[in-house]
């Protein structure tokens, strides 16, 4: 049998066929590229060189090249995952629960309006973790949750502050994609609770902002309602237009319209 570059290409593709890898063949240069689908990192194999080795070593030459390519791609994948961080992200409860049919995201309930998803972030790529990715990572759901919360606590924070009608509003807006994620940092919330004299109200209208407010009067509730609605409408990834009273580790949604209506009804009865 005469071995050609095309036959060698077919032989290598057969041996290196994996769902997470892609092949690209340059017939002019006689080069076969094998790369990871998600990162696009890969290996170029010059086929004439492999054919020349095959003329001497036959089957052993193909086995050696296939082994080299496989080990190199696996090493690249491990390096990429070791550099990646798992972080939690906050999403609306209306956000899709599946990446596609039969492949649900890894999720945790948070509040009546929000849910926690988990992202694999390697700085260059950002992907929500679903069951298939979880299997590739070789992690359990519990391990993902623990790693994500640990990494969330390492996120820095510096608030801007504004006071209106006696109410103080603190804004976090670093635009790192994880501003809303800081709502999961219990030590951050507790430190803010200690400096707040009135009701502690927290809002995550979209993923790139966290608002914490010290509300001391009804005007403050009206302001936080309008503010949250405005941010929600402008956000690239909106989460919820409702804000929450934070007390003893729990988030209670504030239904402003119902609150104001109740107040008005009380005046009319008086």
Curated annotation (Swiss-Prot):
Homology family: Belongs to the UPF0354 family.
UniProt source species: Bacillus cereus (strain Q1)
Pfam family, one: DUF1444
Protein's recorded name: UPF0354 protein BCQ_4506
Signal sequence, renumbered to the chain: none
InterPro entries tied to this protein: DUF1444
Highest taxon of source: Bacteria
